Amino acid sequence: MQSGASETNKLKYRRVLLKLSGEALMGGGQFGIDIPTCEQFARAIAEAREAGAEICLVIGGGNIFRGVAGAAKGMERAQADSMGMLATVMNALAMQSVLENLGVPTRVQSALNMDAICEPYIRRRAHRHMEKGRVVIFAAGIGNPFFTTDTGAALRAIEMNCDALLKGTQVDGVYTADPKLDATATRYHQVAYQEILAKDLKVMDSSAVSLMRDNNIPIVVFSLKEEGSLLNVLYGRGTSTTITKEGAEKP
């Protein structure tokens, strides 16, 4: 068992799903996978695992191909989404490699059967992997077009009985407006699912937020760029926004 297992009871969130965008893997680039950036994320995941957390991941594919963008350029949407799902498998395999280089046992499960390179998605097997301290990366969304990786992440978080869905982003939470465009924007400490949907705050797509609301699983939005931020979220500290049924006024 991990060396931090004795500290597990201090964690606010013990079993979590971490959602990363494909773009996050680009680092400072315009396309593809930046290995040093992946290594930074992997170190944060390894640190969280050592603290006793059980972690699964969903990674988008936008750094390689976005189905919506392909459809906008004239491709059939279902075909474009299938390409996007394949991009998420590439990202999952890259992250698996980086994690295993750090000594973190990792399994990739795909919603599309690719037996030569990863496991098929089997819910009970994924649960068992996590119980044994392995990191599980869910790839290929839910295996169907017209569903985003945000929705796939929400579904997997529910199926894995996660305590929270953690969304690692480029900003440190949810703001009243885009802080890059509006200097008066303020960050919410807590906010209700319904307010996210009503104000269309663009944290995740509406289907994902609705799934989280209906199953009463909190979403925590935080910046992965800050050292130790993932561990801080697991302990319920640091800078972030928590989305719950009740919500709260912004600070």
Swiss-Prot record:
Its job: Catalyzes the reversible phosphorylation of UMP to UDP.
Lineage of source species: Bacteria, Pseudomonadati, Pseudomonadota, Alphaproteobacteria, Hyphomonadales
Domain of life: Bacteria
Binding site for UMP: 61, 81, 142-149
Top EC class, one word: transferase
Catalytic activity: UMP + ATP = UDP + ADP
Sequence positions that bind ATP: 19-22, 62, 66, 169-170, 175, 178
Pathway: Pyrimidine metabolism; CTP biosynthesis via de novo pathway; UDP from UMP (UMPK route): step 1/1
The EC number(s) this enzyme carries: 2.7.4.22
Inhibition and activation profile: Inhibited by UTP.
Complex and partners: Homohexamer.
Compartments where located: Cytoplasm
Cellular component terms per the entry's GO annotation: cytosol
Name recorded for this polypeptide: Uridylate kinase
UniProt key word Transcription: no
Family recorded in the similarity comment: Belongs to the UMP kinase family.
MF terms in GO: ATP binding; UMP kinase activity
Alphabetized UniProt keyword annotations: ATP-binding, Cytoplasm, Kinase, Nucleotide-binding, Pyrimidine biosynthesis, Transferase
Predominant cellular place of this UniProt entry's protein: cytoplasm
